[in-house]
Amino acid sequence: METDYDIIVAGAGIAGMIAASSASIYSKQNLKILVVDRNTQPEAGKKTINGWVCGDAVGKNSVDYMTERIGITWNKPEIEHPVKGVVAYSPDHETPVYFDGEGYILNRRLLPQKQLKDAEKVGIEFRWNVALRGVYT
């Protein structure tokens, strides 16, 4: 097993996959990149242990930025439909937080699989079932 990487990303969720893909794209695939995740490959992007996940909705400006500046594209079916705002609730389900503006609702089952396929195409490697407890340099 390879143990020497330029970049190691902890977590194959939306943010981790964007970080790894961005690094690969900006380096023109010249970096050796590893993504580790506690889940199995079919469970990539699975909700966190406590059941909460951020990322079911995303702003249009974020998707536009990824498309135009990084080269990451999401379309249907990963993007289910556009929205003109969302309401998020605090963990106790009592306090609403309103977000106005154009955005999209994401398909959290299909998006991680698309991100994996795109990442593998540019040479990003993965290790699954890894419980990361610390980082040593």
Question: Each predicted region: which residue ranges?
Answer:
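N-terminal Rossmann-like FAD-binding beta1-loop-alpha1 element of flavoenzymes
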Residues: E2-V35
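Conserved N-terminal helical subregion
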Residues: P82-T137
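Flexible, glycine-rich phosphate/dinucleotide-binding loops
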Residues: G16, P42, T95
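A generic secondary-structure micro-motif detector
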Residues: V9, W52, Y104-I105
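Predominantly flavin-linked oxidoreductase catalytic cores and closely associated redox partners
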Residues: A12, S22-Q29, Q41-A44, D118-T137
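N-terminal FAD cofactor-binding segment of flavoenzymes
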Residues: S22, Y26, R38-V86
